[in-house]
């Protein structure tokens, strides 16, 4: 019967080891059926929000390969001086140390780029791409073809970049601080106004145990989401001594990386 089947012992495996347990839940652990639900904001009040990076929604026309960026900055030095070409980084670029750039014309005076044919061609291509989109929201963006479709980049300071997907073979998720001048793509997530204390907790064994338990998976790799993983994580309230200790150790890790 169904009741007899429910009462039978189940087998739970870890490598070559097998355990007999009474119940296996959706996280593949011997525990009751309790599931983490998505949240829109962190359960811990002291941590800043995690967001996606900025989405170009441009048909690839605002994105530059390193040689394209170098050519434009050499031919038109003012583009570099004004910050119109920025490093552009997502999960793959961060993890594999790849370089990409983007045209970042938000807040840049039109006189800086309006007479540059290479840029004007790209802007017109973005406009056409958006105008012919089946999505009404994207078509509206055709009015502003020189800028990204969704902009979430902090204007100053630094942020922690967190890859959306990373290998399960790693003992921790590779993440780190980047300056506001480096544009985070929507292929990654970021935490603006982040501190060394937050970095220390996010790269801790405690947080990784949480990731392994509740994060989604792509094949076997971790899919880190703000709504499930970050927002539900019970970040501990830190007294001054604990905060200073975490800050010191995180700063040491960051210094070794450099």
Language-model-derived ranges and their functions:
Residues 12, 16-255:
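Polybasic, glycine- and aromatic-enriched phosphate-binding surface used to engage nucleic acids
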Residues 1-8:
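Conserved beta strand-loop-helix elements of the APE1-like EEP
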């Amino acid at each position: 019967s169904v009741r007899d089947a429910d009462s039978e012992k189940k087998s739970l495996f870890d490598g070559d080891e097998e355990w007999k347990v009474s119940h296996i839940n959706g996280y593949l652990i011997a525990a009751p059926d309790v599931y983490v639900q998505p949240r829109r904001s962190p359960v811990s009040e002291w941590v800043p929000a995690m967001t996606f990076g900025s989405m170009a929604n441009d048909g690839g026309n605002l994105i530059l390969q390193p040689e394209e960026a170098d050519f434009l900055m050499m031919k038109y030095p003012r583009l570099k001086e004004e910050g119109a070409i920025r490093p552009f980084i997502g999960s793959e670029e961060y993890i594999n140390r790849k370089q990409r750039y983007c045209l970042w014309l938000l807040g840049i005076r039109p006189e800086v780029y309006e007479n540059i044919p290479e840029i004007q061609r790209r802007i017109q291509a973005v406009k056409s791409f958006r105008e012919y989109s089946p999505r009404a929201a994207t078509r509206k963006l055709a009015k502003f073809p020189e800028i990204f479709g969704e902009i979430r980049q902090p204007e100053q300071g630094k942020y922690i970049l967190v890859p959306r997907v990373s290998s399960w073979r790693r003992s921790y998720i590779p993440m780190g601080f980047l300056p506001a001048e480096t544009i985070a793509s929507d292929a990654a997530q970021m935490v603006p106004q982040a501190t060394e204390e937050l970095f220390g907790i996010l790269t801790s064994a405690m947080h990784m145990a949480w990731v392994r338990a509740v994060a989604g998976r792509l094949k076997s790799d971790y899919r880190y989401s703000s709504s499930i993983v970050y927002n539900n994580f019970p970040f501990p309230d830190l007294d001054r001594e604990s905060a200073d200790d975490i800050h010191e150790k995180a700063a040491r890790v960051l210094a070794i990386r450099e």
